[in-house]
Amino acid sequence: PDLEKGWKVVEASGCDNAKIILDTWHWVRANQPFEKVIDMIPADKIVSVQINDVQARPYAKEVLRDESMHDRVAPGCGYGDTAGFCKMLQQKGVKPNAVGVEVICDEYVEKGVDFAAKYTYDNAVKVLKEAWPEVLA
């Protein structure tokens, strides 16, 4: 699935409270362009954003879920242009109710939960300060 299909489900629901959650990992792995797809969705229909980053090469399609569950990297530390994703949403006027970090990375956890939490937090703040400082206020 991609954002266009997800948006069609939200639209077809006819519910005012049906909204979209965007995630940078899914965005990159679905090969979504920055400039085109987001235009069809009103800014107020994007309720939440999850940021993270991706490895340089995706896992094979048959095991892509394994990448999602073990190798998402901290925002700005991979190859997915997390800052560009955030800038796209900021320029569209998106004001999400929540911006979260969804980093699931065995390498970070092996260094300890304290390391994983601090490293992920520090890199998320760095990306957001650069690309979308309003969400930090």
Language-model regions, residue ranges each:
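Histidine-acidic metal/acid-base catalytic patches
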Residues: 3-22, 27-137
